[in-house]
Amino acid sequence: VRSRRQRQMCIRDSTVEMLRETVGEVGIDPAILGPVSADVRPKAPGMKYRHYAPKADLTLVEGETEAVVETINRLAGEKLAEGRKVGIICTDETKDRYPAGMLESIGARARQETVAHNLYAVLRDFDDRGAEYIFSEGFSEDNLGRAIMNRLNKAAGYHILKV
């Protein structure tokens, strides 16, 4: 938190709600919410660059569950038909709806702590298994979900499909 400003500015998104309870209104640095231009100086390591990214191309698919599952299945099927190795990041609630590719449930949606804890391990696992393409479900951005989505967005290089 930078204390010399009139309004506090959070550069670590996972603590926004906790900070608001303590200090009142807190802004979120734009680098947390999306890609920043090359001329912007990052305020903290990892705010500007793609990091903790898998070797595979990662696409984040956001929207209503039905549309997300349908889109991921279609995209994964296309890549599998080309002979590519495909990974899918899903949740406990949707894992039975993906018949194709390497599948990793990151946890239950209601357990954001578990999802956050499993994220990097799942990405590294896909690297170890040789995935060339990874498709991930998006997550709600409330509470810890904002940090999860920030990490996924950066890992995907902001390659996001909204369906």
Language-model region placement:
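Accessory alpha-helical/coil subdomains and C-terminal extensions
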Residues: 21-38
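A short secondary-structure junction signal
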Residues: 8, 19-20, 72
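Glycine-rich phosphate-binding loop plus the immediately following alpha-helix
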Residues: 13-23
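A C-terminal functional module that forms or caps the active site or interfaces directly
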Residues: 40-157
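Single conserved hydrophobic/aromatic residue that forms the stacking wall/gate
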Residues: 1-11
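Short, flexible loop segments at boundaries between secondary-structure elements
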Residues: 160-163
